[in-house]
């Protein structure tokens, strides 16, 4: 079978952010045109613009942040193609938390890969040590029963700001920072016996949140200098023109 070697430089244009010219971190894609950027770069750009930075198509006239989504597949590809990028990003996050004197979340305490890996000089492929494979299998079993309790946690207060819906009996919840707004919509819909979670909008500071926003992202971008808990409001979905 014939194989063809491709230099990383040849595909850089497909795995870098047009806004910062660096490799994609927390890859986020515009749903309208499928162009991808670093999440922090795109969110900052959309604070003053409503068009795609690449093709200039209008994402949405008033709420462009609702039409972007985390692209896990693209981020996985970038991490696999660029040696050491994921480990470097994890290290930067740990240093960030240490600098602020905050506890490092459980999901980034260790190295990005739980197994010890080395690069095969013959073909550039990554291989894991046998002992690490055994340790990884045992750790995975423990993680399966963890239910994200070791993740960074976020305290939330869910308030209803519409007379058309009732309030939750227990409006205070605590969950993983990796949970998304979509998870909250499903939770509220189940508690209120709604026919569909798509009937809801969730807001922070009177701004509608995109369904793919993680709670960590919401805290960092909308609640950074405010005290816990994170205050969110829910209401019946309003169609935006």
UniProtKB/Swiss-Prot annotation:
Main location per the UniProt record: nucleus
GO molecular function terms listed in the Swiss-Prot or TrEMBL record: histone H2AK119 ubiquitin ligase activity; zinc ion binding
One GO cellular component, as annotated: nucleoplasm
Gene Ontology BP term (one): random inactivation of X chromosome
Subunit structure: Component of a PRC1-like complex that contains PCGF3, RNF2 and RYBP. Interacts with RNF2. Interacts with CBX6, CBX7 and CBX8. Interacts with BCORL1.
Basic and acidic residues composition bias: residue spans: 117-139
Subcellular location: Nucleus; Nucleus, Nucleoplasm
Lineage: Eukaryota, Metazoa, Chordata, Craniata, Vertebrata
CDD domains with a match to the protein in the record: RAWUL_PCGF3 (cd17083), RING-HC_PCGF3 (cd16735)
Gene: PcgF3
Chain spans, region Interaction with BCORL1: 131-241
Matching SMART domains: RING
Domain of life: Eukaryota
Keyword presence, Repressor: yes
Region (Disordered): 115-148
Organism: Mus musculus
Stretches annotated zinc finger (RING-type): 17-56
Protein name per UniProt: Polycomb group RING finger protein 3
Mutant phenotype after disruption: Combined disruption of both Pcgf3 and Pcgf5 causes embryonic lethality; there are no live progeny. Male embryos are detected at 9.5 and 10.5 dpc, but are smaller than normal. Female embryos are already extensively degraded at 9.5 dpc. Placentas from male embryos have some parietal trophoblast giant cells, but fail to form a labyrinth. Placentas from female embryos lack trophoblasts altogether and fail to form a labyrinth. Defects can be attributed to the observed lack of monoubiquitination of histone H2A 'Lys-119' and lack of Xist-mediated silencing of one copy of the X chromosome.
Function recorded in the entry: Component of a Polycomb group (PcG) multiprotein PRC1-like complex, a complex class required to maintain the transcriptionally repressive state of many genes, including Hox genes, throughout development. PcG PRC1 complex acts via chromatin remodeling and modification of histones; it mediates monoubiquitination of histone H2A 'Lys-119', rendering chromatin heritably changed in its expressibility. Within the PRC1-like complex, regulates RNF2 ubiquitin ligase activity.
């Amino acid at each position: 079978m014939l194989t063809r070697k491709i230099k990383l430089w040849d595909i850089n244009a497909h795995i870098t952010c047009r806004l910062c010219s660096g490799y994609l971190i927390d890859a986020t894609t515009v749903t309208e045109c499928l162009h991808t950027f670093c999440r922090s770069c795109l969110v900052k750009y959309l604070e003053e613009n409503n068009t795609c930075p690449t093709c200039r198509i209008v994402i949405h006239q008033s709420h462009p942040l609702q039409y972007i989504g985390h692209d896990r597949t693209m981020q996985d590809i970038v991490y696999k193609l660029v040696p050491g990028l994921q480990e470097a990003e994890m290290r930067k996050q740990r240093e960030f938390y240490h600098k602020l004197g905050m506890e490092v979340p459980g999901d980034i305490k260790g190295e990005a890969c739980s197994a010890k890996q080395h690069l095969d000089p013959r073909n550039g492929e990554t291989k894991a040590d046998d002992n690490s494979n055994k340790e990884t299998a045992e750790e995975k079993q423990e993680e399966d029963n963890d239910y994200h309790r070791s993740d960074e946690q976020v305290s939330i207060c869910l308030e209803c700001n519409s007379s058309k819906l009732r309030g939750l009996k227990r409006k205070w919840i605590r969950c993983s920072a990796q949970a998304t707004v979509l998870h909250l919509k499903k939770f509220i819909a189940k508690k209120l016996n709604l026919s569909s979670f798509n009937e809801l909008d969730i807001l922070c500071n009177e701004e509608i949140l995109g369904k793919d926003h993680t709670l960590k992202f919401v805290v960092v971008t909308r609640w950074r200098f405010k005290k816990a808990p994170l205050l969110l409001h829910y209401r019946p979905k309003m169609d935006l023109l």
